[in-house]
From Swiss-Prot:
The gene is glyA. It catalyses: (6R)-5,10-methylene-5,6,7,8-tetrahydrofolate + glycine + H2O = (6S)-5,6,7,8-tetrahydrofolate + L-serine. This is Serine hydroxymethyltransferase. Pathway: One-carbon metabolism; tetrahydrofolate interconversion; Amino-acid biosynthesis; glycine biosynthesis; glycine from L-serine: step 1/1. The record marks H225 as: Plays an important role in substrate specificity. Belongs to the SHMT family. GO terms for cellular component: cytoplasm; cytosol. InterPro entries: PyrdxlP-dep_Trfase, PyrdxlP-dep_Trfase_major, PyrdxlP-dep_Trfase_small, Ser_HO-MeTrfase, Ser_HO-MeTrfase-like, Ser_HO-MeTrfase_PLP_BS, SHMT-like_dom. The modification N6-(pyridoxal phosphate)lysine is found at K226. Its EC number is 2.1.2.1. It comes from the Bacteria. It comes from Listeria monocytogenes serovar 1/2a (strain ATCC BAA-679 / EGD-e). One of its GO terms (biological process) is tetrahydrofolate metabolic process. HAMAP family: SHMT.
């Protein structure tokens, strides 16, 4: 960043501080990951200069012959990765991918069945503070109070009762596998479209470690970061018959020019995900997640559902008399980054919460294995049991520094 350092030291210094934070902290936010240097290189390329409204071969501007190559690469790799007939890689985010799908088949006021936010859903699955909850009549399904897992009989009952035009499956804080085939059965029974938001598990799906929703869903949306380990962005997958309508929903429906430098980075990330090494990485994610859950529970920390089938798990802090807000703050002070998170049947506000969400995708990218992640579990447990013990917290902070130094991040930057 020699040019930036010379011309705008304030921005340069802030970026260097963030690099230092990422290197020094144990990153456990489930929606974050560390992209490769080549993904970052593509994002910082001259493609950021090019406006390219429309789609390859059908642009509203001239000079798009080379960015067309890039977008075609991204689309083809995405289709190969997930076995899809159609891919749109232009959505700027997962939220906009979801919006485009809604815009394609729903009218304002239509009924949609989605997962309760505090039970693990997402803002765009019908939260009243989000466009989805404002424009459409969302009704909710959730998890069982005893198991904290989705009960498909309850989902079916809700679908039969409300007769939604669409059912949304997928979650932002659900640690167990989701049965998309079962959702398809329920959707067919009530004549509903099925949209699956696989943003959190897309990498695991690509690696064959979670049921692929693409054969079952009418529409599959995802982000391109998280477990897929690409740049921040969105994507839509569907059958070829939806190409014209979905393309129109993205442009000119809800977006203007695509971000060609980000699409290039998506293409690079998809190329990485097609390699055998990516499957090995995702297998390690699962092992690390299970080991972390096991370690936390062995140290008297409550893990919802008793474990995890994916990259994340939810910690219930109520037995410890703690809030997510307090735990997040103190963990961050010792160099462990998590986020406060509501848990099913929450009694606290979303700004306080009774839980924290932890994910292992980023630390697994960094090279953490089961031995390292067991140490992380012990460190988290010590903090949660000693939230006001300065001596213990100082010791944990020192051990965090030792651990992160063993796994260098971006040494060439």
């Amino acid at each position: 960043m020699v040019y930036l350092q010379k011309q705008d030291k304030e921005v340069f210094d802030a970026i260097k501080l963030e690099l230092g934070r990422q290197r020094a902290n144990i990153e456990l936010i489930a929606s974050e990951n560390f992209v490769s240097e080549q993904v970052m290189e593509a994002m910082g390329s001259v493609l950021t200069n090019k406006y390219a409204e429309g789609y390859p071969g059908k642009r509203y501007y001239g000079g798009c012959e080379f960015v067309d190559i890039v977008e075609d690469l991204a689309r083809d790799r995405a289709k190969k990765l997930f076995g899809a007939e159609y891919a749109n890689v232009q959505p700027h985010s997962g939220a906009q991918a979801n919006m485009a799908v809604y815009h394609t088949v729903l009218e304002p006021g239509d009924t949609v069945l989605g997962m309760n936010l505090s039970h693990g859903g997402h803002l765009t699955h019908g939260s009243p503070v989000n466009f989805s909850g404002v424009l459409y009549n969302f009704v909710e399904y959730g998890v069982r109070e005893d198991t904290k897992e989705i009960d498909y009989d309850i989902v079916r009952e809700a679908a039969l009762k409300h007769k939604p035009k669409m059912i949304v499956a997928g979650a932002s804080a659900y640690p167990r596998k989701i049965d998309f085939a079962k959702f398809r059965e329920i959707a067919d029974e009530v004549g509903a479209y099925l949209m699956v938001d696989m943003a959190h598990i897309a990498g695991l799906v690509a690696a064959g470690l979670h049921q692929n929703p693409v054969p079952y869903a009418d529409f599959t949306t995802t982000t391109t970061h998280k477990t897929l380990r690409g740049p921040r962005g969105g994507m839509i997958l569907a059958k070829a018959e939806w190409e014209q309508k979905l393309n129109k929903s993205i442009f000119p429906g809800i977006q203007g020019g695509p971000l060609m430098h980000v699409i290039a980075a998506k293409a690079v990330a998809f190329g990485e995900a097609l390699q055998p090494e990516f499957t090995t990485y995702c297998e390690q994610i699962i092992r690390n997640s299970k080991k972390l859950a096991e370690t936390l529970q062995a140290n008297d920390v409550a893990v919802l559902t008793g474990g995890s089938d994916n990259h994340l798990l939810l910690i219930d802090l109520k037995p410890l008399g703690l809030t997510g807000k307090a735990a997040e703050k103190v963990l961050d002070e010792v160099g462990i980054t998590v986020n406060k998170n509501t848990i099913p049947f929450e009694t606290e506000s979303p700004f306080v919460t009774s839980g924290i969400r932890v994910g292992v995708a980023a630390v697994t990218t960094r090279g953490f294995d089961e031995v390292a992640i067991e140490k992380v579990g012990v460190l988290i447990s010590e903090v949660l049991h000693n939230l006001e013990n300065e001596e213990v917290l100082a010791d944990v902070k020192a051990r965090v520094a030792t651990l992160t130094n063993e796994y260098p991040l971006y040494p060439s930057l």
